[in-house]
Design a protein with these regions (language model features):
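C-terminal membrane-associated helical module and adjoining short loops/tails
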Residues: 83-86, 93-95, 206, 224-373
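C-terminal cap/substrate-recognition subdomain and adjoining C-terminal extension
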Residues: 1-108
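Membrane-helix interface "capping/anchor" motifs
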Residues: 206-216
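Non-transmembrane, extramembrane segments of multi-pass ion/lipid transporters
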Residues: 55, 64-89, 145-158, 261-275
Length: 373
């Protein structure tokens, strides 16, 4: 029995020695193999085993035997430092396209020929963009642990480690404070609307996004607040038509995005969308609510053109305004068709910026507006 155990021990030791040789051969330096040898060795181990592992160096590596051991973290590749593209991604500069709604009151109030109004609207766009970028950084810092486990969000600069937590905090504070101070300097009403936006956005991130219908209503309100910001910064007259249209239109788009999430989890065995308050059986309801809201938005626009724009005297040929709701309705129906097919991969507004058909419909609508003047 003792001979058998001794034989087994020698075989195990032989395998360990061979493994140590392979590790030493691959590592190339004594400093790299020493921690591994320490791990494999035993207080009662054969000293020859240690000598084998420490001397099994490849050709050309003997001169490195006296080099000090390297720390374990040097075996890992450090993430690249953030470049301009990383910061642009972290600040979500592509999302600034949504902030273009700030310029909408400038056109509807027919102040687009006034340099002062154009300047203030542009400053408002930049100031508000800084605060929204700060809010995106804060959200990523809060969700950092979850983002690092997410299949796509783990590539975000903060989650990937290309931007450090300290850098994120400093930039977020700088942008937030700078944006709020700039908002106060532009207009107290603009600053108040911006504070309301940030408060609602934070509430959405921490709680409201998990509540069915409350989430899409919050998104709708955030879009409408962008229009309110544009109205406040140029001191234009408030338009109930525009605000009503915005609530119905963006409510429909927000539901379209939720609808595609429901369709994608259908058949996966899940009953609910992760992190949302919807169940897969409610997809027909979201479709009904969303398409009804789209129809309501188009009715409001048609009533505005007929009852206000056509009789305002601001347009020489108001009839050319009617292609605008027609093109918008076609675009909304296209969004819902893609949502039903599960092909709407982006936010509808961001999708429109990348979609060729959306651009074609937009050109027709813009041509109608130009001919109306």
């Amino acid at each position: 029995m003792m001979l058998r155990r001794g034989s087994d021990f020698k075989r195990r030791r032989s395998r360990q020695t061979a493994g140590a040789r392979r590790i030493a051969r691959r590592s190339g330096t004594r400093g790299e193999i020493e921690p591994i040898v320490d791990h494999l060795s035993h207080p009662h181990g054969d000293p020859a085993f240690l000598r084998e592992a420490q001397t099994a160096l490849p050709a050309g590596a003997r001169e490195q035997r006296a080099s000090p051991p390297r720390p374990a973290d040097q075996f890992f590749v450090a993430p690249e430092r953030a470049g301009i593209a990383d910061w642009a991604k972290q600040l979500r500069l592509h999302q600034w396209a949504k902030n273009g709604l700030i310029f909408l009151p400038l056109f509807l109030a027919h102040k687009f020929t006034e340099p002062h109004a154009i300047l203030w609207a542009t400053l408002g766009f930049v100031v508000f963009g800084c605060t929204t970028s700060a809010n995106y950084i804060i959200n990523d810092l809060v969700d950092l642990k979850a983002d690092r486990l997410h299949p796509t969000k783990r590539r975000r600069p903060l989650a990937a480690g290309r931007i450090s937590i300290a850098e994120g905090i400093v930039v977020a504070v700088f942008l937030m404070v700078g944006g709020l101070v700039g908002g106060v300097l532009l207009s107290p009403a603009f600053a108040a609307a911006m504070v309301a936006y940030l408060g609602l956005a934070i509430a959405y991130s921490f709680r409201l996004k998990r509540l069915a219908l409350a989430d899409v209503f919050t998104i709708t309100t955030l879009f409408t607040l962008r229009i309110a910001l544009g109205t406040a910064v140029i001191d234009a007259k408030w338009s109930p038509w525009l605000l009503s249209f915005s609530m119905f239109f963006f409510f429909s788009l927000a539901l379209a995005k939720r609808n595609v999430e429901l369709i994608r989890v259908f058949g996966s065995g899940q009953r609910t969308v992760s992190g949302r308050g919807y169940e897969i059986d409610e997809a027909p309801l979201t479709t009904a609510f969303g398409t009804a809201a789209a129809v309501g938005a188009m009715i409001i626009m048609l009533l505005y053109i007929t009852n206000e724009a056509a009789v305002s005297g601001n347009y020489r040929t108001p009839a050319w305004l009617f292609p605008i709701p027609a093109m918008m309705f076609l675009w909304t129906l296209r969004i819902w068709l893609l949502s039903y097919r599960g092909l709407l991969n982006d936010d509808p507004v961001i999708f429109a910026l990348r979609d060729r058909v959306s651009w074609m419909l937009g050109v027709v609508a813009a041509l109608g507006l130009a001919l109306a003047f």
